[in-house]
Amino acid sequence: MQRFLPLILILILLLPLRAQERRDRAVFEVRRDAMLDSIETFLQKEKPARAPRKLMQLDFSTVQGPAAVSEFKSVWHLPPALQGLSGMCWCFSTTSMLESEIHRQSGRVIDLSELYTVYWEHVEKAREFVRTRGRSFHGEGSESNAVFRIWKKYGCLPAAAYTGLKSGATFHDHENTLFPEIHSYLASVKAANAWNEETVVSTVRAILDHYLGAPPAVVTVDGVKYTPQEYLARVVRIDPDDYVDLLSLMEKPWYEKVEFPVPDNWWHSADYYNIPLDEFMAAIKSAIRKGYSIEIGGDMSEPGYSRGAAGMAVVPSWDIPAAFIDDEARQFRFSNGTTADDHGLHLVGYVEKDGKDWYLIKDSWSSAYNSSHPGYYFFHEDYVRLKMLCCSMHKDAAKEVLARFK
């Protein structure tokens, strides 16, 4: 009996831990996005007729998470804004972060134009399409650091000076109009081998001008006229070079600047600081606690990602236990395609519950507007660990990470 005593004691000690483990339930439901439906109805978009399909997802009624935005300790940020039917999340999330940065650094409130950045990103995509003779990826999306790249070249504008919405429009609709027309035109350029950059760029700009309006060359603020470059330098006073991108993928060497291997990184930026998962999470935890907000990007296709009233993102216990979320688990999902670079978001707050962080996420996509906290998601720390691939933040918030690099 004595030789079994240590084993019995271990089992007794483990029983309370076992009892405390969260055991989630699954349900099969038709995923509905009420806000997206209302946008499509407003835009008179016809949906293809198909029978509703029930999908396996988490029963969020069993999840004990934050109940309200007010529970979070948050940094200053402007209210959420809808991106409509478009792939502009990369710009909405990063612009939101930079608006928060302006306030953090100077206390000023400046609402910036996302569509001005998007306009010039389309132009740069067209240039690259010509340069590579049609081999570059052409899609609606991009990455967070595209905002920094565009600002350095073209500057920026206040939101009131350039909305990208024609008179009477309420929602952006690039999926049915702007993007298909540009994409079709570039396909015709490739088919005809008509690689005249000046012609291609001027045609793409004509399409952009038709749907978004031409961006102003000069803006007047408080009685002073500025070009977009002057507005960035003299009014906004944000240095795009002060922001860094962190990545955590074990397929790339640790502690090196690497390329983020996803289609939306169409210009093959290799400016991502690749670090192990624990350091990636430590950087996020440290930054938000020091008052820095963070742009994050990753996957939103999971059964633990609510499209409805819950407004949460968690990793169900029947997916993977929290203790097993590590570098290998992340990489496995990225390698097999179940984690993708779906969406860009703005992390603006945190609250600690039961020893784990919940993050307040400002979101521009329609599904964030179906809950009791419209425009926001509540992300559990484990969801960020498993499914968020990269993030952007001020370099001062990442000093400890950057010190590991040569």
Model-based region annotation:
Residues E21-R23, E198, S202-K406:
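Active-site signature of cysteine proteases
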Residues M1-R22:
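Bacterial Sec-dependent N-terminal signal peptides
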Residues C91, Y116-Y119, V147-I150, P158-A161, ...:
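Structural recognition of the beta-strand scaffold that forms the well-ordered cores
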Residues E114-D222:
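Papain-like cysteine protease catalytic cores
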Residues S86, W90-I102, S106:
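Alpha-helical support elements that line or immediately flank enzyme active sites
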Residues E21-P79:
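N-terminal regions that are enriched for targeting/export leaders
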Residues V75-G87, T132-H138, W267-N274, A283-I284, ...:
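Second-shell loop/turn segments in exported
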